[in-house]
């Protein structure tokens, strides 16, 4: 993944050895934050199959959410998110134990955009039925447009900019001054 380093320049991003774990934690917290920001009572849970339990203030349903997070390099930005078949079974069992409806949240950091999608597990399986090993959440532009148009899929996104990073000016400061 390369960050914008100004006109015609790219800053190479080198991920840490624990980046996958950190990405997973970040995805869980981003979803938790977004839910809380919009009035959902919610909590992180350490349980096989789900990561978050939330009460939806719009429907009053209790959601058991399994969060899948990925950080993509520049070459992988359109790559699908693989969801192994056993993840669906584990989410279903956990939700049965807690009396909640199974949901999935998919968080992908790709390029300058971090995208999040929250939807019922049943909708994931309708869009992308289980294959031999699992399901694949597609991340190409046509699919992103379909998700944004689908009222059953909640979508949020962060646009990211690294302005300066350890002595390397990435984006000129005056490029952001006009936003104020």
Residue ranges and their predicted role:
Residues 1-48, 55-180:
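Mixed-charge (Asp/Glu-Lys/Arg
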């Amino acid at each position: 993944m390369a960050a914008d380093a100004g006109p015609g320049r790219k800053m190479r991003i080198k991920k840490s050895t624990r980046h996958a774990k950190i990405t997973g934690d970040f995805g869980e917290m981003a979803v938790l934050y977004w839910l809380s920001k919009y009035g959902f009572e919610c909590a992180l849970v350490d349980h096989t199959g789900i990561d978050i339990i939330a009460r939806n203030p719009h429907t009053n349903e209790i959601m058991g959410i399994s969060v899948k997070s990925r950080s993509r390099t520049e070459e992988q930005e359109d790559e699908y998110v693989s969801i192994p078949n056993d993840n669906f079974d584990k989410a279903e069992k956990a939700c049965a134990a807690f009396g909640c409806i199974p949901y999935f949240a998919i968080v992908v950091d790709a390029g300058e955009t971090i995208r999040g999608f929250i939807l019922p597990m049943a909708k994931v399986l309708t869009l992308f039925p289980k294959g031999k090993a699992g399901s694949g959440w597609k991340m190409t532009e046509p699919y992103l447009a379909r998700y944004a148009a689908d009222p059953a899929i909640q979508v949020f996104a962060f646009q990211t900019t690294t302005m300066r990073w350890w002595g390397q000016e990435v984006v000129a400061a005056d490029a952001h001054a006009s936003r104020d």
